[in-house]
């Protein structure tokens, strides 16, 4: 059974990973809070992560935290030689570069979304945008009111997929008094209630509209996907991996 450490264990996704770990064992968690344990899982401060990874004989780390904490634990994983699955979003360019550096020493899988449905959605979007190359594009995402980064990491990944097919300029939260330009894509983020995650791309042409969307009903789907990625990552060579590699395996 894969021995997993969870970074951000006191958060909602951390709890979801513990709950979803039926074929893996969560042996330790990392958090900056004063909590000693979560569901009988001991909690250690991220600054002590390297020692804890050795003490608890951890096979792989699953991370759903904030960028600063994720980078601290990534350094610990490099020190201890432990693979890491990074689900944290909102990294700046320096943070992403530091993760890339870590992937030269350990297997590191970075994903903005661990849903198989999102993987399929991105492939459908790539085909649709490439085929309907003169259609207007609008991208919308909705998440719970506690999410701090906007647009979501998944929306940013979808935008990357679109820009691989078309040279479009994102317009965030459209406002003002001017017509739409042909080479732009509207990107909108909504924060309300306890929405797990909704993403939709609208492609609009003359007299027809195509909508491609995905809705997560429960955050457990992300936790299960992250654990699948963690099990898959153990034993891999050092390098940078993505969730699509797991889905295609």
Swiss-Prot record:
Record field: catalytic activity: (S)-2,3,4,5-tetrahydrodipicolinate + NAD(+) + H2O = (2S,4S)-4-hydroxy-2,3,4,5-tetrahydrodipicolinate + NADH + H(+); (S)-2,3,4,5-tetrahydrodipicolinate + NADP(+) + H2O = (2S,4S)-4-hydroxy-2,3,4,5-tetrahydrodipicolinate + NADPH + H(+)
Name of this chain's protein: 4-hydroxy-tetrahydrodipicolinate reductase
Pfam families: DapB_C, DapB_N
Cross-referenced SUPFAM superfamilies: Glyceraldehyde-3-phosphate dehydrogenase-like, C-terminal domain, NAD(P)-binding Rossmann-fold domains
EC number: 1.17.1.8
A GO cellular component annotation in the UniProt record: cytosol
The protein's enzyme class: oxidoreductase
This protein's record includes keyword Nucleus: no
InterPro entries in the cross-refs: DapB_C, DapB_N, DapB_N_CS, DHDPR_bac, NAD(P)-bd_dom_sf
Keyword field: Amino-acid biosynthesis, Cytoplasm, Diaminopimelate biosynthesis, Lysine biosynthesis, NAD, NADP, Oxidoreductase
Organism of origin: Haloarcula marismortui (strain ATCC 43049 / DSM 3752 / JCM 8966 / VKM B-1809) (Halobacterium marismortui)
Chain positions recorded as NAD(+) binding sites: 8-13, 87-89, 111-114
Compartment(s) of residence: Cytoplasm
Gene it is expressed from: dapB
Residues the record lists as binding (S)-2,3,4,5-tetrahydrodipicolinate: 144, 153-154
PROSITE patterns attached to this UniProt entry: DAPB
